[in-house]
Amino acid sequence: MTEITVNGMTCTSCATHVKDALEKIPGVNAAVVSYPESRAQVMADTAVSHNQLLAAIAALGYQGSIRVGDFKDEPKIRDALEGAGLHIAIIGSGGAAMAAALKAVEQGATVTLIERGTIGGTCVNIGCVPSKIMIRAAHIAHLRRESPFDGGIAATVPAIDRSKLLAQQQARVDELRHAKYEGILDGNPAITVLHGEARFKDDQSLVVRLNEGGEREVTFDRCLVATGASPAVPPIPGLKESPYWTSTEALVSDTIPARLAVIGSSVVALELAQAFARLGSQVTILARSTLFFREDPAIGEAVTAAFRAEGIEVLEHTQASQVAHVNGEFVLTTGHGELRADKLLVATGRAPNTRSLALDAPGVTVNAQGAIVIDQGMRTSNPNIYAAGDCTDQPQFVYVAAAAGTRAAINMTGGDRALNLTAMPAVVFTDPQVATVGYSEAEAHHDGIETDSRTLTLDNVPRALANFDTRGFIKLVIEEGSGRLIGVQAVAPEAGELIQTAVLAIRNRMTVQELADQLFPYLTMVEGLKLAAQTFNKDVKQLSCCAG
């Protein structure tokens, strides 16, 4: 293998051009080029000279120099050699699909990417990005109306123009979609994009019904299914006949309803419920059980208390048995009487987009919910077909999808990489936020792990005291005996900003004492992790502000 330092590349497209130029040289079997590392690795016959390689790079306007030494990542070029010449079909264009497409090209494959709707998938278009923009706007409105500093900063009733907020939101969505999805695909000559709906013909070919009309058959060596998921609709009589909202419609509404009913008790339902409440809606949440009923009970209790303090009505153990829409008004029949609202948001989960794929043709196994069953390498029951993201039985987070897509591409081109989710962080963007990683106590006990735990309320965290906002807690779960940290649950303003430290601690198998011994910057929320760790053998109320 020959390794070359390449100076002058400014983007991934530059790396693609260098790769193409090198692989056009007779005798070059494969090349891997990395723009961030300013490096090319070339596997070639002995007849290929260094001067030939450097000349091909120079012809593109870049400067190359041969690197001398032992190279430890030779498997990367070996993978590319196996991937060279492969044709990979990818169904979808979201986080998993994009990560897989770019990695597959890097590994030497050519890619046909098929998208039936808008390029970019859920996250950038109708999920993470627009919802977080709306949540941020609602947070600003809330602070203008009410803050811990109202005694010295006069509170005001904000004048909210939802149409202008929506225009700002969608402009950023369009900008990110073009910069991170459309522009990247357009600039990569190894990726062909088809706009249409794909279904399997067999385990080596797809039929694509093109949006512009007609059909096209696409053959492949390997295929990745990354079709995502859509809002699930519960079987409530009358619901489908009514103009209810899912998160998709709620995020693009240009008005704020006076009364909003929300069916759901987890992430999407609660994030949007609070956002609409802060923008002016009177919100009522119908929870079949309690809020966040799958998590540690303290999480749901803390968020419920915070919501009720803001005037959001939370009806626990309440289900709608009938939905009607009469004279522009929703009427929900519940066990506690009728509930009336101007709009109804249904956010009870998401269902995988797999029904139209004809997965039975290649014999791909799905579970009872229609999610594709995969192993840690994203392999399905058919060796030619892989899957990643929300259409599978993995956790539905875009960063999990992207990591899965990358590993799927490596495995489709001859590698062997697994996705390890033992220290997977999760964040809910309510206020206070909810952030978790690893085991809850109940989950650990279910797996036969004996635990010890401590819960630190935020009135013991200097940053929270300085903010005059002590809502929430940080809970650490450790393995009894070893003292190893195995789980963290946090409810706190900006809890999402502290959880990654806990991820690294768990990933590196730190004990709670090792965590307590680390240096944490004073007056940061993440310092709460150190204080929580100290509670296993100290009373932190008796410590000075920044006691080590």
Curated annotation (Swiss-Prot):
Keywords: Disulfide bond, FAD, Flavoprotein, Mercuric resistance, Mercury, Metal-binding, NADP, Oxidoreductase, Plasmid, Redox-active center. Hg(2+) binds at C545, C546. It comes from the Bacteria. It catalyses: Hg + NADP(+) + H(+) = Hg(2+) + NADPH. Its cofactor is FAD. A metal cation binds at C11, C14. Its EC number is 1.16.1.1. The keyword DNA damage does not apply. Residues 1-65 form the HMA domain. GO terms for molecular function: flavin adenine dinucleotide binding; mercury (II) reductase (NADP+) activity; mercury ion binding; NAD(P)H dehydrogenase (quinone) activity; NADP binding; oxidoreductase activity, acting on a sulfur group of donors, NAD(P) as acceptor. The keyword Disulfide bond applies. GO terms for biological process: detoxification of mercury ion. Pfam families: HMA, Pyr_redox_2, Pyr_redox_dim. It is an enzyme of class 1 (oxidoreductase). Disulfide bonds join C123-C128. Binds 1 FAD per subunit. Homodimer. The active site is a redox-active disulfide bond. Belongs to the class-I pyridine nucleotide-disulfide oxidoreductase family. Resistance to Hg(2+) in bacteria appears to be governed by a specialized system which includes mercuric reductase. MerA protein is responsible for volatilizing mercury as Hg(0). This is Mercuric reductase. It comes from Pseudomonas fluorescens. The gene is merA.
